[in-house]
């Protein structure tokens, strides 16, 4: 027979969101990629009714299909095609959001070889239509993440068509650091709210 106490001691529990709000997130220690953390952030924004932003599916080129039965076609060979635009898009407070995400283990620069001409052209087209376009750059070794407006990326790319790396100093001068947290993990909408919709950014 189990005797249960009549007056159990109630412990004060701190809400998880409040408890971890300012805790720094280390993606490597958590076994999570930067992309996964952005996806988790977007899921948080969607669940809270803050924004609707999704990762665009990577296009696939089907090479060979097996038909063991008429009703069951099986793809046996395919490969990923190069994405023609950016990684993410959606809407926030009536504004179209479009951005790319890149990660590096380098400490002083972001390799520009990861950006392709068609992506730069797409970003320029988004800006022309008054959309909010940017890149999220994560320096894994430094544990630093930056929001770089698309215009700053385009300006640097046009110097030599993206043949050299973008110095971290340039990113710090022209971008904004994103303070990582728990809920959401990569709060990039804070930058948009404060610097763009708030009117601080020229």
UniProtKB/Swiss-Prot annotation:
Presence of keyword Hydrolase: yes
Cofactor binding: number and manner: Binds 1 Mg(2+) ion per subunit.
SUPFAM superfamilies: Restriction endonuclease-like
Catalytic activity as recorded in UniProt: Endonucleolytic cleavage at a junction such as a reciprocal single-stranded crossover between two homologous DNA duplexes (Holliday junction)
Molecular-function GO term, any one: nucleic acid binding
EC number(s) given by UniProt: 3.1.21.10
Entry annotated with the keyword Cytoplasm: yes
UniProt-annotated site: Transition state stabilizer, residues: 102
Gene Ontology biological process terms, A to Z: chromosome segregation; DNA recombination; DNA repair
Family to which the UniProt record says this protein belongs: Belongs to the RecU family.
Protein role: Endonuclease that resolves Holliday junction intermediates in genetic recombination. Cleaves mobile four-strand junctions by introducing symmetrical nicks in paired strands. Promotes annealing of linear ssDNA with homologous dsDNA. Required for DNA repair, homologous recombination and chromosome segregation.
Protein's recorded name: Holliday junction resolvase RecU
Organism: Streptococcus equi subsp. equi (strain 4047)
